[in-house]
C-alpha cells in the first residue's frame, strides 16, 4: 500500500471520528485506525489506545469480537502475555466465543509450558464438534505438541526454542527469533 493511500485511509477514519458523534460507526472507525497502527505502522502502543477506544464505544458484535482478538494480538506484540491472558479471561466471562478461546490457547502456547497448553487443547476439543471450523486447527496443535514435545529430549528442547522464536516473531523481534533458533 502506498503512503498516499495509507494517509488517505487514516484521514478518512479520523474525519469519521470528528463528524459522526455518537454513531455506531465510531467503534468501527477506532477499530480500523487501530488495525492500521498494528498491521501497517506497527505502532503497538497507539494501536492499543485506539482499539481500547473502540471497545468503549459500544461496538456491534462483529466489531467487538474483532477488536477483542486484535487487542490480544497487540498485547502479544508488546510482550504483555500475562495481560493478554487476563484480558481474554475477562472477555470469556461475558462471551463464550470459540475464537476468543482459541486466542487464549495461543497466548498460553506462547507463554506457558506445552503441558499446560495441551490440557487447554484437550479441554477445547471436548467442547468442539468435528464440523466446527476450528476443530482441525486445535487437532493440528495437539498433534504438533504430541509429536515434538512429548518425544525425546532433543526434540523437546528444539520445540521450546521454536515456541520462544514464535513469540519473538509476534513481537517483531526478528533478530531474537533467529538467535533462538541457532
Where are these regions (language model features)?
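Acidic, polar-rich low-complexity tracts and alpha-helical solenoid repeat scaffolds
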Residues: 1-182
